[in-house]
């Protein structure tokens, strides 16, 4: 089995204690922990700051990556947090996700949309609107997934431990995320 995880800094395993975008060690990243639990190859296609691809260059880059990684058994997509952090509305973000998922040339049964866990108050999260929007985004993503016939995993209530910024998972948070995602995918 081969799984491609396409996401942002939390998929990448960003360690906010490092100034230049470093990663947690593999044993503390949810992608690598999931690979161990599932006993399969899991490709980490996380990127710091990534928003939902919508520009031609971003879409071409995704298409090339997908082509290079095929055949795949599952494509896990977890994006939208950075779109919210940039001030976009839940409606805009969910429309972007729908447009992105619609163009992916895989069987819909192979696509899993993961609604991101809750953000918490922290250095990056000083506006309660973002906390509410994160929950609302999961509800909107559920609707998108049902409409498109892709699988949806809602991570809203997984109680993911985050770092001082309120956004990035701690090492404990990565462990909790991997455990919950493993159970959701079984």
Question: Where do the model's predicted regions map?
Answer:
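Alpha-helical cap/lid subdomain in secreted, periplasmic
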Residues: 28, 36-37, 60-186
């Amino acid at each position: 089995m081969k799984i491609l995880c396409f996401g942002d800094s939390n998929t990448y395993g960003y360690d906010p204690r490092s100034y230049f975008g470093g990663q947690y060690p593999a044993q503390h990243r949810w992608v690598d922990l999931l690979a161990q639990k599932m006993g399969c190859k899991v490709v980490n296609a996380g990127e710091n700051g990534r928003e939902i691809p919508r520009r031609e260059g971003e879409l071409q880059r995704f298409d090339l990556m997908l082509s290079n990684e095929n055949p795949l058994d599952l494509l896990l997509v977890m994006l939208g947090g950075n779109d919210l952090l940039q001030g976009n509305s839940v409606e805009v973000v969910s429309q972007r996700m729908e447009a992105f998922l619609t163009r992916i040339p895989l069987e819909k049964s192979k696509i899993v949309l993961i609604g991101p866990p809750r953000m918490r108050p922290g250095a990056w999260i000083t506006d309660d609107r973002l906390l509410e929007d994160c929950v609302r985004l999961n509800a909107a993503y559920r609707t998108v997934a049902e409409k498109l016939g892709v699988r949806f995993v809602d991570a809203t209530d997984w109680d993911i431990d985050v770092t001082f910024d309120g956004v990035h998972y701690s090492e404990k948070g990565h462990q909790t995320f991997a455990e919950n995602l493993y159970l959701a995918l079984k």
